[in-house]
Every structure is written in structure tokens, then in C-alpha cells.
């Protein structure tokens, strides 16, 4: 099941550490002094295993996404790896360099399946990932002063770098002069690293080793920078070739294949998405979406656009080519398939994500907002599957953050009735991710006074009460986080709606106060979430102001009467046995 684009949660970011091929968050090598050197190495790298979300869609960061998963039999994977493993070790032997026999030696080289012949793009991604892994591990061993391991891994790094350069040169077109210069610098630094680490093996004086360690760190940093520059140039060149192919093609099969390759690249992380946007990928894909002869390719092109627009550069390019107008045309045209309109909704959800500050300046979106919102509500109402409903509701949820007028539009379109009716349809609403979108819309609409009467009329208070009991089915971190968001937003919605005495009395009648007290006092009920606790305390205090008779004295004295921060501290420190 795909998960939707983010709608304003302070949700966790994607996998930390090494970016797919790009800049890593600043980590530090534990080498005394030379802070600049410590950080420079870890600014470049590839980690194919990070598997950033396909669309970078999350529920409020929306988890999102079609994950780029490779399900390959382990024996088959080992057979594919064997060629590169033996190649590397043979090169080490030819250079008369010993391979370490330390107990952790086998874990120092991690390889994915080998690229096919004549596939420069996959070759770059694979070799780049291997080299970045080696760089990271050399840094770790250097911090531990394990010089034998540092040296053997440096030799292996040189082998991989030489292989990447020679293999790419063999399958690529004429190399750029700039690439040749960087290749030369990279190999020089690799040789320098091997030589200096070999000398370190002969040194026993700690003071001398300390000074040499700084030199190794500096060399490693420069090597990482050259590697990153070379990889970016090579990937940019390959992306340019794909974009030109899409732009010039009038053959549906060629366009389908090339667009699929471009989509696969977007799954490798934000840095590659930036390159694709910069090199005209957004322009080329919207060109596809404006040609009737390519209508069957619209879903694939839109899916790729949604992934590219996870970065600001993609959104900028989308606005430059009037992409919002194109999306509005697709969403409002009933002749398009449901799948096409759902993918267009996914792009809307992505470009309106509150996590991208640039989306707040999409002036073109305001011009088409009414027809887009109307089309999305209709798509929610007619959705034939949970995935279609999820994408459409995620787009609506993000739009309610984007502009306050959207909430008034939704009220006029009877969106509350559409959403609440969908909650009883398991075919459309069957995951906490989808309920997260629904309760987000309700929470943002609840600031309008007219919303309360519609909620009561559609038995919405009972639905909100049910959301306070949202539980994960699988126990995965993403689903647990989604359930926490549902509980938190349900409490926020209840607190806002309880300004209306009728809503407050209905909530008390449905025992909402008892459930709120349970969430406050029992950490396991809220997965020990502080955000859920604060929201529940706020809702409980609002209800107590209208119907104080629904509280016992102990609950009033501990959860309502003190300052909010005092009640929070009391509940957050409670042991489970207290209940």
C-alpha cells in the first residue's frame, strides 16, 4: 500500500546517515583536531540500501511511497556479487598487498547485485555505493586506530575506484575533459592514501602516528570530495541523455522505457531528484502529459513527477511550465482513467506539502484551487480502492494547510459527509495512514464555526471517539507513528469542536472524557507519545469546562486544575502500575 505525501507533521525524516548518493548529514570522524577534515569525508556518499521512499510521501511527512525494494534470492545475490569480490581480491594480490585476516574482515565489503553489461547508469550507482561504503568504514577504522584494517581497506578502495573509472569509460560515450581531470585527481588520492597508510603500519611512536593520522584524515577527505564530484558529473551526464531521449521521442515504447528508467532514478534519493529537475526532467515529463498520443503513459509520467517534486527544484520547474494548470485539466477531465487522476492527485499532494517552504509561494495553484479541490472531493467520493482514496485525501489534507480558503470550499462541497461516509467503507478506508488524512482535514476544518453542526449531523463525534482508540495492526514503526498522529489529531479536533456546547455534550455522552483520561494516565495507550498526551489534556480541559460533572475529583485535581505543564509532567512520569 502506498503512503501519502506529507501534510504538516513534525514527522521523522527518512533514513539518516548516508544519502543515497549525495551529501550526508554532518557526521564527524573521531580524529583529534582537523574538524574540517573530519566532516569533509562524510559529505559525499552513496547508500543504495537507505531505500528512501519512492515518492518521498509520508502521512504528514507521509510515509510514502513506493519503496524501491529488490527482492532477490540470497544465493542468486551471492553469485552476482562473486565476480566483483574475486576481482577486487585478485587486484589486491597482484599489487602484493595482504588481505587482512581479522575476524570482522568479511563484513567490510558489502556488494549489491552486479549491473548488466552496457548499463552505465546502474554501474555508476553500484560502484558508487560500494565506494561510499568503503569510505565510511575506513573512517570508522581510522577513528579506532586500527591501522592494519585501514591500510587493507584503502587498497581495496583503490581497486574499486579504478574499476569504476575503467568500466564507465568502456561503456560511456566520449568522456568530458572535466571528468578526466577529476578521475586523475581521484586516483592520485587513492594511491596517496594507500602509501601513507602503509607507512603508518611501520610506525610505533604514538606522537608520530597522531600526526600521520591527521594526514590520513585529510587525504581521505579530499578523496571523498573528488569521488563525489566525479559521481555527480557522471550521473548528470546519464540523466541528460535520458531527458533528451524522452524529449525527442515520438515512440510510445521508447518513451515508456525511458520514463521508467527515470522513475527508478528518483527512488535513489533527493540528490538524484535535484539533478533530474535541474536537467529538464520536469519539462520533458509534462510534455508527455500534454500529448494525447501518450495518454496511456500519463500515470507513469505523473508518478515520476511526484517523486521529482519532493525537492524544491522540482516544484520550481513545475511552476515554470504551468504544471498546476496541466494537473487541474487532468483532474477535472472525466475522460481520463481513475489511475491517471489518482497520480495527478499524488503530484498535487507532493507540491502542496507543508514540508516544502517553496509551496507556499505557488501563486499558480491559488488560481486553480477551487476546481482542483472540487475534483479531489469527487475522486474521494468515487474512489474504487484504498490507494486512490489515500492519494486524493492526502492532497486535500495538504491543501487545507496551504490556504484557509480551502476549508471553506470543503465545507460548501459537503466534504465532511463524503469523508465520514468513507470511514465506514473498508474498501476505501482501511489503514491508519488514510484515517490520518481524514482527521487532518477535520482538524483543520474544525476552526470554522459552521463545521460543528455538520460534524454532529453526520455522527462525526462518534468517529472521532473511535480514532482516539486507533491501534497499529502490524507494529511497524511507520504504522505506530501513524496511529499516534491519528490519536493526537483526533484529540485536537475534539478540543476545537468542543467550543460548541452541543458537541461537548455529545462527546461526554459518548464517554470521550473517560477515553481521554485513560490516554493521559496510561502511557501504553498512547505509545508513550508526549504529543498525544498534550492534545488529550487540552481536549479534557475543554470538555471539563462545559461538563465538569463528568470528572471524578482525583481526575479534576490532577488533570484539569493544575497548570497544563504540571499535569503533563505528572502524567509523563507515571508508571504503568499506577492505573
Swiss-Prot record:
GO molecular function, one term: cytoskeletal anchor activity
Effect the entry attributes to changing residue 97 to D: Abolishes interaction with GPSM2 and GPSM1
Family annotation (Gene3D superfamilies): Inscuteable LGN-binding domain, Leucine-rich Repeat Variant
Keywords: Cytoplasm, Developmental protein, Differentiation, Neurogenesis
Primary subcellular site in the record, as a coarse category: cytoplasm
UniProt cross-references to Pfam families, sorted A to Z: Insc_C, INSC_LBD
Motif (PDZ-binding): 576-579
Region (Important for interaction with GPSM2): 74-89
Any GO BP: cell differentiation
Gene Ontology cellular component list: apical cortex; plasma membrane; protein-containing complex
Annotated localization: Cytoplasm; Cytoplasm, Cell cortex
Tissues expressing the protein: Isoform 1 is expressed in various tissues with stronger expression in liver, kidney and small intestine. Isoform 2 is abundantly expressed in small intestine and to a lower extent in lung and pancreas.
Subunit-structure text: Interacts with ALS2CR19/PAR3B and F2RL2/PAR3. Interacts with GPSM1/AGS3 and GPSM2/LGN (via TPR repeat region). Identified in a complex with GPSM2 and F2RL2.
Task of the protein: May function as an adapter linking the Par3 complex to the GPSM1/GPSM2 complex. Involved in spindle orientation during mitosis. May regulate cell proliferation and differentiation in the developing nervous system. May play a role in the asymmetric division of fibroblasts and participate in the process of stratification of the squamous epithelium.
Protein name (Swiss-Prot/TrEMBL): Protein inscuteable homolog
Organism encoding this protein: Homo sapiens (Human)
Amino acid at each position: 500500500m502506498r503512503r501519502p505525501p506529507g501534510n504538516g507533521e513534525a514527522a521523522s525524516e527518512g533514513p539518516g546517515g548516508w544519502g543515497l548518493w549525495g551529501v550526508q548529514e554532518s557526521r564527524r570522524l573521531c580524529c583529534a583536531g582537523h574538524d574540517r577534515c573530519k566532516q569533509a569525508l562524510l559529505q559525499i556518499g552513496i547508500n543504495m540500501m537507505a531505500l528512501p521512499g519512492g515518492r518521498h510521501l509520508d502521512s504528514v511527512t507521509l510515509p510514502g511511497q513506493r519503496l524501491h525494494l529488490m527482492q532477490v534470492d540470497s544465493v542468486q545475490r551471492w553469485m552476482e556479487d562473486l565476480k566483483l569480490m574475486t576481482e577486487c581480491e585478485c587486484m589486491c594480490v597482484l599489487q602484493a598487498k595482504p588481505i587482512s585476516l581479522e575476524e570482522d574482515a568479511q563484513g567490510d565489503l558489502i556488494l549489491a547485485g552486479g549491473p548488466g553489461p552496457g548499463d552505465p547508469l546502474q554501474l555508476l550507482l553500484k560502484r558508487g555505493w560500494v565506494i561510499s561504503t568503503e569510505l565510511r568504514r575506513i573512517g570508522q577504522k581510522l577513528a579506532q586506530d586500527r591501522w592494519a584494517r585501514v591500510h587493507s581497506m584503502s587498497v581495496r578502495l583503490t581497486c574499486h575506484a579504478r574499476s569504476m573509472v575503467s568500466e564507465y569509460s568502456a561503456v560511456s560515450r566520449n568522456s568530458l575533459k572535466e571528468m578526466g581531470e577529476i578521475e586523475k585527481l581521484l586516483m592520485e588520492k587513492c594511491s596517496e592514501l594507500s602509501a601513507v597508510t602503509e607507512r603508518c603500519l611501520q610506525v610505533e611512536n604514538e606522537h608520530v602516528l597522531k600526526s600521520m593520522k591527521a594526514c590520513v584524515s585529510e587525504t581521505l577527505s579530499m578523496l571523498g570530495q573528488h569521488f563525489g564530484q566525479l559521481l555527480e558529473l557522471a550521473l548528470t551526464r546519464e540523466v541528460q541523455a535520458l531527458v533528451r531521449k524522452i524529449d525527442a521521442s515520438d515512440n510510445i515504447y521508447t518513451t515508456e522505457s525511458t520514463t521508467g528508467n527515470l522513475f527508478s532514478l528518483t527512488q535513489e534519493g533527493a540528490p538524484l531528484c535535484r539533478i533530474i529537475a535541474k536537467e529538464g526532467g520536469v519539462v520533458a515529463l509534462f510534455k508527455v502529459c500534454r500529448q494525447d498520443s501518450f495518454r496511456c503513459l500519463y500515470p507513469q509520467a505523473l508518478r515520476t513527477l511526484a517523486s521529482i517534486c519532493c525537492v524544491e527544484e522540482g516544484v520550481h520547474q513545475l511552476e515554470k511550465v504551468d504544471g498546476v494548470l496541466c494537473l487541474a485539466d487532468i483532474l477535472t477531465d472525466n475522460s481520463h482513467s481513475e489511475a491517471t487522476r489518482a497520480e495527478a492527485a499524488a503530484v498535487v499532494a507532493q507540491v502542496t506539502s507543508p514540508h516544502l517552504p517553496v509551496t507556499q509561494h505557488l501563486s499558480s495553484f491559488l488560481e486553480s484551487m477551487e476546481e482542483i479541490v472540487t475534483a479531489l472531493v469527487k475522486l474521494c467520493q468515487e474512489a474504487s480502492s484504498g490507494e486512490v482514496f489515500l492519494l486524493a485525501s492526502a492532497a486535500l489534507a495538504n491543501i487545507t494547510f496551504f490556504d484557509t480558503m480551502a476549508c471553506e470550499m470543503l465545507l460548501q462541497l459537503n466534504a465532511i459527509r463524503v469523508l465520514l461516509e468513507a470511514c465506514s467503507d473498508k474498501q476505501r478506508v482501511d489503514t491508519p495512514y488514510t484515517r490520518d488524512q481524514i482527521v487532518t482535514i477535520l482538524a483543520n476544518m474544525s476552526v470554522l464555526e459552521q463545521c460543528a453542526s455538520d460534524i454532529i449531523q453526520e455522527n462525526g463525534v462518534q468517529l472521532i471517539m473511535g480514532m482516539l482508540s486507533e491501534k497499529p495492526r502490524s507494529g511497524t514503526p511507520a504504522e505506530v507513528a501513524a496511529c499516534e498522529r491519528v490519536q493526537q489529531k483526533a484529540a485536537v479536533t475534539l478540543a476545537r469542536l468542543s467550543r460548541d456546547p452541543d458537541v461537548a455534550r455529545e462527546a461526554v455522552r459518548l464517554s470521550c472524557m473517560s477515553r481521554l483520561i485513560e490516554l493521559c494516565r496510561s502511557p501504553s495507550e498512547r505509545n508513550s507519545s508526549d504529543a498525544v498526551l498534550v492534545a488529550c489534556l487540552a481536549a479534557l480541559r475543554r470538555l471539563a469546562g462545559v461538563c465538569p460533572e463528568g470528572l471524578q475529583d482525583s481526575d479534576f485535581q490532577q488533570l484539569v486544575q493544575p497548570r497544563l505543564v504540571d499535569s503533563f509532567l505528572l502524567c509523563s512520569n507515571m508508571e504503568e502500575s499506577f492505573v
